[in-house]
């Protein structure tokens, strides 16, 4: 019990000093170039990503599949799954991050300039994990579950590092929109 108290106190102090909110993140998108008559003639990508504006543009099966595989308690918790986090910590197997935590990690990565700083966003440390927990809780206070899912679907790489967003991956791998998955 005394060892637990010795660990809990510094963790609590560390927690207090962590930010609760993410800085605004701008994510690369597709730009369509128009000629003098307004006719599109090229698309330029700052990232290989097609953003959707509504969850209605994604099939219910894709949404259900994401929640079932990544975070079955997504609609019950306020930022992270206690059982998933505890399971990952006790088994020392990694993982355990729910949808909001994964989103926060990705948004931090996009927000950090330079490879060294981006490495900090994904390094496997207890400090990073604790920071993600607090940021995920803060993110869930500001955003609805639907907003979180939509942002997740628009920012995560599906299937390969070059297929960011479910729409891009759906078109690339299946030749159809995400609404038809």
Segment roles from a protein language model:
Residues 27-181:
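Peptidoglycan glycan-strand catalytic modules in the bacterial/periplasmic cell-wall system
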Residues 1-32, 40:
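N-terminal type II signal-anchor transmembrane helix
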């Amino acid at each position: 019990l005394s060892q637990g108290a010795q660990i809990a106190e510094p963790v609590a102090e560390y927690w207090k000093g962590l930010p609760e909110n993410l800085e605004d993140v701008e994510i690369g998108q597709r730009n369509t170039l128009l000629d003098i008559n307004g006719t599109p003639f090229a698309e330029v990508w700052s990232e290989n990503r097609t953003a959707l504006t509504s969850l209605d543009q994604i099939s219910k099966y894709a949404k259900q599949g994401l929640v079932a595989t990544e975070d079955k308690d997504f609609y019950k918790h306020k930022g992270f799954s206690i059982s998933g986090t505890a399971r990952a910590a006790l088994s020392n197997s990694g993982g355990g991050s729910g949808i909001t935590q994964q989103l926060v990690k990705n948004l931090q990565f996009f927000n950090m300039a330079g490879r060294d700083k981006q490495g900090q966003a994904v390094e496997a440390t207890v400090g990073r994990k604790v920071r993600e927990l607090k940021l995920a809780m803060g993110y869930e206070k500001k955003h609805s579950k639907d907003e979180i899912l939509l942002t997740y679907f628009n920012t995560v790489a599906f299937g390969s590092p070059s297929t960011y967003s479910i729409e891009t991956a759906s078109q690339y791998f299946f030749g159809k929109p995400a609404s038809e998955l």
